[in-house]
Amino acid sequence: MPVRPARCYKRIKGPPYTREEYIHGAPMIQIPKFDMGTTSAAARTAFTMTAKLVVEERGQIRMQALEAARQMASKYLTKYVGDANYYLRLNVVPHHVLRENRMLAMAGADRLQEGMRLAFGSPAGRAARVEPGQVLFYAEFKPEHLPHIKEALRRAASKLPLPTRIVIEPKGNGGNKTVT
C-alpha cells in the first residue's frame, strides 16, 4: 500500500505511542547510521567549528524524511569534503509509532467508504516528535569547509516537513553564534 503524504502526520495529536511491548507489528527503525564521517573522538579534536540544523516549529518528522535528509547531507559532504574532514550526527530518533485507519478504494466505486469514527488504526510507520529549538543534525568541521557544510544542511532541510535554521558557532563552551 502506498505511503500517505507527510501532511497527514506533521502535527502532533495525542500522547506519544511508543510502548513496543503493547504494539504488535510496529515497524523497525529504518535509519542504519546516526553518526557519519570521522566518528573517532581523537580525530574530531582537529575540528574547530560546529553547525546545527535547528527546528523552529513543534511537529512530527517521519523516519523516511529523516533518512532522506541524512542521505542527502552525507552524500554531499562525502563528495565535496571527504569522509575524514567532517563529523555529522542525526540527533533525533523516531520512537513514536504512527497509526493508519486504512480505507478501501475500489475501482468503479460509486459510494465512499465512511468507516468507523475515531478508529484506532494499525501501525503504519514511525516518527520523531520535535520541539522548537531542538537540534536535528549536528556537524563538526574545519573553517575552510563552512560553505559545503551549510549547503549540505540546506539540502537536508529541504527533505524535512518543518521549517529549520542553521546555527554556526565555534566548537567549545559558547562563543559568538552566527545564525543563517
Swiss-Prot record:
Membrane-spanning ranges: none
Organism: Pyrobaculum aerophilum (strain ATCC 51768 / DSM 7523 / JCM 9630 / CIP 104966 / NBRC 100827 / IM2)
InterPro entries according to UniProt: Ribosomal_uL16, Ribosomal_uL16_arc, Ribosomal_uL16_CS_euk_arc, Ribosomal_uL16_dom, Ribosomal_uL16_euk_arch, Ribosomal_uL16_sf
MF terms (GO), sorted A to Z: structural constituent of ribosome
Keyword Transit peptide: no
Gene Ontology BP terms: translation
Protein name: Large ribosomal subunit protein uL16
Family under the similarity heading: Belongs to the universal ribosomal protein uL16 family.
PANTHER family: 60S RIBOSOMAL PROTEIN L10 (PTHR11726)
HAMAP family, per database record: Ribosomal_uL16_arch (MF_00448)
Alphabetic keyword roster: Ribonucleoprotein, Ribosomal protein
GO (cellular component) term, any one: cytosolic large ribosomal subunit
